[in-house]
Each structure stands twice: as structure tokens, then as C-alpha cells.
């Protein structure tokens, strides 16, 4: 069968299942609102958890610095090179130093994206003599990192730490190094990893623990350093991965680690070496947002309070709302049910996108409500009331 015919059939199959994706065009943002199709909707599908992307004072302060310029090239629009050539600007070092200091770590390393981090770190650190144990619901970028790495890998049942321990016990003495990889906040179910249990297992079996805090940074911990900070286990994490593209309202990612690991990754990590570095201007903005979020304890508390309120209200109304984080999934089952609810909410003034298989398991299509700290209690209550009326 010619490739064009195969693709056409696959597209028809996706359309028949209501799983055909397109790139929706969005317009201006105004606080928690987004313009879509000429209408201003309350945005419940963004990862800008703290609202930093539209904080006027922060943006004005940063823009004033941009207008003054910088002799060290910190506001250049492009790096035009890999970091190992001519793309390693001083502002990148400032950002990494600020991150390492905040975490009390020896070193930090900035990457172009969380995808670059997760597809590069494991293949660099592991060999064919190693084993990687990964939570089954880890992000696609982690899964791709597993596939690229030469090490063997197993995926333990989601949050089933008894299963993980069985795998650790059976691997004892058979590998040079065992790695445990988990997210802290799982983005589709909104649940949290038991990091204290994972630290205990890491210590007992001599494993290396890597935690992806993509959805935890900015939201958890007194200084927004993530769930590891909130649970007091930071010093027990071998590598912590964070992202600038969510609560920090920028682009790129970082990893916190020992100086030894950092030096090794600089020399071996293909997704760091063989790519053009981030523009210095974006590194400068990331430094501004990272510094600002360290002080946003009140916003974090408000955000988590909103999530608890919405989850309880919808749960009392008969909706299935698993998890316990600022990400509130509303599981509706069939694909068409999720698509219909999203369309009805759009008519009511809300931008809440459906998530369907294969992103989530079959018969668990859902709305993934991503809450923001700049939402008001009244807006959350109105959303819950609207969803109840649409269901009845």
C-alpha cells in the first residue's frame, strides 16, 4: 500500500473515532482569559499556573531592562550556536547559578525544553549494563528517553510501589546501576507520586532517583521548588528536572544535580550538544520569572485551595475527578462525551479542551482543567455550576 493511501486511511480512522487533531489558533491573552475564534474565553487549558505570563509589574520591570540593553548580550534575540561553540552567554550561567543556589545544589544545567532534557539525560547516564525503572504514566518524553537509551527498562504499574520494589529486588546484583524515574505531579490524572516511599526504595536498593517536576515547580513548596521541596526530600533526589514552560511562563527546562553529573552531561548529552542554544533574551526572562516565583507562596496556597474546592464541588455533583493537585481531570468516558462537554463549555465562555486516547487509556476521555492562581473563587464556583447544568 502506498504511504499516501495508508496515511489517508489512518486519518479517516481518527476522524471516525473523534480523535483527529488540528492546531487551534489562539489570540491575545488577558490575565486568565484567552481569545479563541474571536471570543474571549476563561482559559482552563494553560500551564501558566501562577499567572506569571501576564503579570504586568514583572513584565514592565523586565521590559525596562531590555530597553536599557546589556553589553553582555543578555537580550540578544538568538544564540545562533550550540552552547559548546558560541551560544553560551553569561546570562545562562547566571540562571543556572540562581537555580542551583535556590535548591542548595552543586550545579544546574539549562536545556532547550523538557523534551530535550528527558530524551537526553537517561541515554547519556545509562549504559547497556544498567536498568531503568519508570512509572507507567510518565510523560512521553521520558518514554522516548527510555527507547533511545541502551539500558534495559521496565515500566512499573502507576504509583504501585510494591510492584516497583519487586522489580528492584529481582534486579539486585544484576546491573551496574538501577535508575528510578518518576514525575512528581502526573499531568493527566493530577495525582502525586509518593516521593518519600521512592526515596526509601532508592536508599534500600542503591538506586539512582530522577524526578521530573514539570508540573510541580512553582506550585509546591514554600519557595515553589516543587513537590520534593514540599515533602522535604530535595537532598535525596539525584537529578531533579524542572521546566520554564509551565508555571514559570517562559521556555526551556533545567536539571539540578551534582557538579560531576553536570560536567559529564556537557560532554555526552546529544540533546544539549547538537542543538542551537536558547536565545539569551529568553534566558533573561526565565531568570526574572524564576526569581519572582520564589516569593509567590500566597499564590500557591490560593491555587491549591481553588483546586480542592472545584474537585470537591464536582465530586459531590457526581463527576469523577481523580487526583489531588492543581490539575483537575474530569473523566467522562467516551470520546464523544468529552468532545461534547468541551464544546458546550466553549459556548458558555470556557476554554477547556478534551483529552482522548491514546493520550489517556481507552474509555477515560476527559477534560483536563488546569487552574491558575489568578482565578477567583467566584469563577471556580461558576464553572462548577455550569458543568452541573450541562450534565443534567
From Swiss-Prot:
Q: Which residues bind substrate?
A: 21, 139, 359
**At what positions is N6-(pyridoxal phosphate)lysine found?**
246
For this protein, what reaction is catalysed?
6-carboxyhexanoyl-[ACP] + L-alanine + H(+) = (8S)-8-amino-7-oxononanoate + holo-[ACP] + CO2
Keywords attached to this Swiss-Prot or TrEMBL record, sorted alphabetically, are:
Acyltransferase, Biotin biosynthesis, Pyridoxal phosphate, Transferase
Query: Mind listing the GO biological process terms from this record?
Result: biotin biosynthetic process
Q: Which residues bind pyridoxal 5'-phosphate?
A: 114-115, 187, 212-215, 243-246
Q: Which is an annotated Pfam family here?
A: Aminotran_1_2
Source organism, top-level taxon: Bacteria
Needed cofactors: pyridoxal 5'-phosphate
Q: A single Gene Ontology molecular function, please?
A: pyridoxal phosphate binding
Q: Which CDD domains match?
A: KBL_like
| Transmembrane portions of the chain | none
EC number(s) given by UniProt = 2.3.1.47
Is Transferase given among the entry's keywords?
A: yes
| Pathway stated in the Swiss-Prot or TrEMBL entry | Cofactor biosynthesis; biotin biosynthesis
Role: Catalyzes the decarboxylative condensation of pimeloyl-[acyl-carrier protein] and L-alanine to produce 8-amino-7-oxononanoate (AON), [acyl-carrier protein], and carbon dioxide.
Quaternary structure, from the entry: Homodimer.
Query: Into which family does the record put it?
Result: Belongs to the class-II pyridoxal-phosphate-dependent aminotransferase family. BioF subfamily.
Looking up PANTHER family in the UniProt record yields:
8-AMINO-7-OXONONANOATE SYNTHASE (PTHR13693:SF100), CLASS II AMINOTRANSFERASE/8-AMINO-7-OXONONANOATE SYNTHASE (PTHR13693)
Name-wise, this protein is 8-amino-7-oxononanoate synthase
**What high-level taxonomic lineage is stated for the organism?**
Bacteria, Pseudomonadati, Chlorobiota, Chlorobiia, Chlorobiales
